[in-house]
Amino acid sequence: MRKIIAGVFIFVFLISNLYADLVAEVTTGVIQKPLVTVVSDNVVDQFPQQVNFVIVADLNHNAKLQANDTIKYEIKQKQNIPWKSLKSDYVVLTKYTNNSYNNYTVEVQILKRNDTSYLQAITYKNINVSLMRALAHKISNYVYQKLTGNQGFFLTKLAYVKVSNPYARYGRLYELIISDYDGYNKHVVLRQTDNPIATPSWSNDGRYIVYSSYSGGSMGVYTLEIATGKVTRITNYKGINSSPSFSPDGKEIALALSKGYSDQTNIYIMNLSTKALKRITINGINTAPKFSPNGQSIVFTSDREGRPNIYVASVNSKYPQSSILSTKIHQAYEPNYTPDGKNIVFMNQSSRTSGTQIADFNLANGSVTNITNGKADSSPTVSPYGDMVAYISTNTRGYSSLDMVSLDGDNHFNIETADNGNILIQSPSWSPKNF
């Protein structure tokens, strides 16, 4: 029996001279990221410490900045900032005013070493303590954008599947969970017993998740409206109905269908209004389709040449036709475009290394770079602004974890870990925007 739990979810100008100053120095092959220190000029209670702690964590979870926190003491005026001892390139100075019970005004100022003026300042008014993490992520987005010129992703969400009792014959519990990007504020939005939930994927407007599941002994593709919890079955073909993903405009989905009980699956595009299908592939086992950011092509996995690899097909071709992405790749699965369409991130099984890692394929020069070094890394999903990749890592004991890595492979951190083999974490999908 399915139980639905409804989920309700609750500045872009550039400063050219600031960005010109923000250049990472390269010393002996190591990129030195600009250091940001977060301090407060008045520690009124624990609330400032909690907010600043989250800001520091956010500014360490990216490829362009690093941060630390010196809230153990107060800075009364910007002239008193001990730049020499801080060794910081920038300071984020926060001031908290307790307006009333559990309600604050927060002022944020960005300061630069050897500069006596504020670079940027913003004020957030009437913030309730219950919004502590949301406020911190919002401040982090503001700081990140002002210091890098790129949009922050700290108010984005992750959807993923948690399976309890995965090896039991009966009583397996599948939960579709939505959390903040860093794993906090988890909400179960769909719960099913003995009917798997697989490969969730967001619509571009963030309103729907499409996924595959079983019901009544047959496989189908479903949409979940996040705000209401409404589930709609949209396919009912015999055999395999799997790996759905939305087109950028939300009018179509790409999916894998066997159209019967054959040993082959093919990629189709379904018009969500008419339910009309367009076939994209014609032979082999084809699965895990993803649209390009412009919606003009689909990247997917196929074994048509004897082993799984990545192929690309045009959505506008009159007849099914596709080509292998690169002969440099030995075996590959689960491809995803980066938001700018310049790279493809995938699960890589190289002939030179054991196990599977997450890798990045550069479409311009054809280079392949592993960005993780685990033995069983899978299911990559790219952040909406392209800086980070979330994925599943499984250790030698079979315990799974939801982890994150920067696209350059430099910054790794854990989001959630299954602390025993009786729980599996699967199929992460990154939301397309901040909420």
Swiss-Prot record:
Cellular component terms (Gene Ontology): periplasmic space
Record localization: Periplasm
Stored SUPFAM superfamilies: TolB, N-terminal domain (SSF52964), Tricorn protease N-terminal domain (SSF69304)
Keywords: Cell cycle, Cell division, Periplasm, Signal
Domain of life: Bacteria
GO biological process, one term: protein import
Signal peptide segment: 1-20
Quaternary data: The Tol-Pal system is composed of five core proteins: the inner membrane proteins TolA, TolQ and TolR, the periplasmic protein TolB and the outer membrane protein Pal. They form a network linking the inner and outer membranes and the peptidoglycan layer.
Protein purpose: Part of the Tol-Pal system, which plays a role in outer membrane invagination during cell division and is important for maintaining outer membrane integrity.
Protein name: Tol-Pal system protein TolB
Organism: Francisella tularensis subsp. mediasiatica (strain FSC147)
Phylogenetic placement of the source organism: Bacteria, Pseudomonadati, Pseudomonadota, Gammaproteobacteria, Thiotrichales
